[in-house]
UniProtKB/Swiss-Prot annotation:
Keywords assigned: Late protein, Virion
Keyword Metal-binding included in the entry's annotation: no
Lineage, broadest ranks: Viruses, Varidnaviria, Bamfordvirae, Nucleocytoviricota, Pokkesviricetes
Protein name: Penton protein H240R
Localization per Swiss-Prot or TrEMBL: Virion
GO cellular component term of the entry, any: virion component
Family of this protein: Belongs to the asfivirus H240R family.
Main location: virion
Induction comment: Expressed in the late phase of the viral replicative cycle.
Entry superkingdom: Viruses
């Protein structure tokens, strides 16, 4: 009788990948945040680069990062319980559920930094999945506290500029720009200081010559960058 040979065991190795979810690289037409993750060789506008495909993900780690004050908050005491929670929509099948039925992957302590920003310090910076996630291609982070979802001011605005009067016409009035804020103007590499902010117009001392009257205005104080570290199992 011929002996039956056991099938060889497939070994697995652990891979680690880091990515930075940058709000200025969110997917077009997706607000507030939604990101597409692709290997570095395929990166371009509105793509978050990773070393390779994120498959068989078993653990996710987050590090401290800054956020602007949400539109619903004015003071640090407005954060109920001094906590903020982060939930990834695509990973909803594996998440922590709190007593209110809300889901999250990470809990943060809110630490004041300035009148414009707070720092989020992870209470537990690691989330281990019960079952490996087959693939992570998109991530949509949702922030909330015990009062509900948090909405943030935009970090990029499409605006009209008048070089003759050195003013920029804002598309909305409920922005959070104020005198003294520093902004980037598309096509010009230096930070510009807002000399005066009145209604839905901001005035800058010297607006550089631009090829178009319609430009992008980048607002550094509103930018959110979420540092994540993934651990995956790969067959070898």
């Amino acid at each position: 009788m011929a002996a039956t040979r056991a099938a060889p065991k497939t070994a697995s190795k652990k891979e680690h990948q880091y990515c930075l979810l940058d709000s200025q690289e969110k997917r077009h037409g997706h607000y507030p945040f939604s990101f597409e993750l692709k290997p570095y060789g395929q990166t371009g506008a509105n793509i978050i680069g990773v070393q390779g495909s994120l498959t068989h993900v078993i653990k996710m780690t987050v590090f401290p990062f800054m956020i602007p004050f949400p539109l619903q908050k004015i003071h640090i005491d407005d954060f109920i319980g001094g906590r903020v929670y982060l939930f990834f929509k695509e990973l909803d099948v594996q998440a922590i559920s709190d007593v209110n039925g809300m889901q999250y992957h990470f809990e943060f302590k809110v630490v004041p930094v300035s009148s414009n920003q707070v720092e989020l310090l992870p209470v537990n910076n690691k989330y281990k999945f019960t079952y490996a996630i087959p693939e992570v291609q998109y991530l949509t982070p949702i922030f909330y506290d015990l009062s509900g979802p948090l909405n943030f001011p935009l970090d990029t605005l499409s605006v009209h500029v008048d070089s003759l009067t050195n003013h920029i016409q804002l598309p909305i009035q409920n922005h959070n720009l104020t005198t003294g804020d520093r902004v980037f103007i598309s096509g010009y590499k230096h930070l510009q200081t807002i000399e005066l902010c009145k209604n839905n117009k901001i005035f800058i001392k010297c607006i550089p010559p631009l090829s178009s009257e319609k430009i992008k205005l980048y607002i550094p104080k509103n930018r959110i960058r979420i540092p994540l570290y993934f651990k995956s199992l790969k067959n070898v």
